[in-house]
Amino acid sequence: MDTSRIFPIAAEPYAFDLKPAQCALLIIDMQRDFLEPGGFGEMLGNDVSQLRRTIEPNRLLLAAWRMQGLAVIHTREGHRPDLADLPPAKKIRGRSATCIGDAGPMGRILVRGEEGHDIIPELYPLATEPVIDKPGKGAFWATDLHGILQNKGITQLVVTGVTTEVCVNTTVREANDRGYDCFVPSDCVGSYFPEFQEMGLKMIKAQGGIFGWVGHSSSLRAVLV
């Protein structure tokens, strides 16, 4: 693959011009507590199969991306063990019997260093791939993601992960405000709620692509050869 070329990728609202040398794969919050049976997501009554369907498309895209030596960055949502970075408003949000920092099936919920906070084995980062530990929904707020991307000369992002309407959408909007072009493969992002999945993707591509482009991972993989 000639990474200096521009590759038109089928997308909505119109084709996305992929520039591989300037594009990073940003995988959002594919964490055990969100995706695995018995984790925090399931404890809240959610159907984790809605998220688990994204694992295989992400695995295939990640393998193809790595094969070309392109930039990969992962994120995890979570907090310091002392919870000093956890706003009270976030702690009580949802009014669940179990809150962030409480004991869960895979350690303390959304606390850095705990089993449930870590990324699922199927997509586990290589030692050379930065992992952004973020305390909020967006991957740019209170992190060094923007600086890392600038240092790598990145101007485009392929954004995958969970959940579509929360952390993926928030990150895409943050990226858009910072001048990054974002492509979201619909099969590589997921929501516990099908209606939120649909609307989350519609919002990204609305009004001529106000926040970015929406397509399918197969279109990306077709050029990663």
Residue ranges of model-derived segments:
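A short, glycine/acidic-enriched catalytic loop
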Residues: 37
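Short glycine-enriched, charge-decorated loop/helix-capping segments at active-site entrances
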Residues: 40-50
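Active-site-adjacent betaalpha module
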Residues: 1-24, 33-34, 51, 60-68, ...
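Short catalytic/ligand-binding loop motif for oxyanion handling, primarily in non-cytosolic enzymes
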Residues: 80-84
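N-terminal nucleotide-binding beta1-loop-alpha1 segment
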Residues: 28-29
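Glycine-rich, aromatic-flanked loop segments that form ligand/cofactor-binding clefts
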Residues: 25, 74-76
